[in-house]
Structures are given as C-alpha cells and as structure tokens.
Amino acid sequence: MARIELAPEIAEDFDRILNHLASHDVEYAGQRVAGIISALNILEHNPLIGRPVANAKRELIIGRRGQGHVALYRYVPEIDAVFVLAIRSQREAGYPERDSEA
C-alpha cells in the first residue's frame, strides 16, 4: 500500500477551490473537498491509475463535468510513495507555478 504525501501548497489549492465554491454559492462545499480527499485515497492501492503526463508525473481525474478536479502527482515505486503536487478544477488551464515541484 503506497504512502500518500501532500505538498504544502495543496492547502492553497483547497483554499482556492473553497473560495471559488463560496463565490458561486455552492452548497455542500465541504463535501466536495471531502470527495477530493476520498478520491486521492484511491492512490494508496492503485498509484498508477492516473494518466501519465510529462516528467514522470501523473494526473488523477476526480469527479466529472463542472464539478471535476485534476490532481497532479508523482509515484515513486522505490519507496512506494505518492506525492500529490497540485489540485485544480478541470476547467482551469494548467497548474499554479511552483518552485518546489519535483
């Protein structure tokens, strides 16, 4: 079972997501974030489920349509660990620029 580590910047991603949901008066915003966290837990048992992207990273698609999100992560099989680097809405273009991305 792979260990899951969240980058410190993930807190900023959740803040951005919650602020967006609040600005659109979305009910159950906390449940949406809980759904994202629940989806990330899938990576414990299946770390290669995400689609491959550049630089040995992968993307996990979470949810669907206007409620969907994408988690950028890297799996390191040598230590059986998943490092979640960023989370964004499926409607956002790209990820925030971060100096610490591995």
Language model: regions and residue ranges:
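Basic, Lys/Arg-enriched alpha-helical interface segments
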Residues: 1-59, 64, 78, 101-102
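Enriched for short, Lys/Arg-rich terminal
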Residues: 21, 64-102
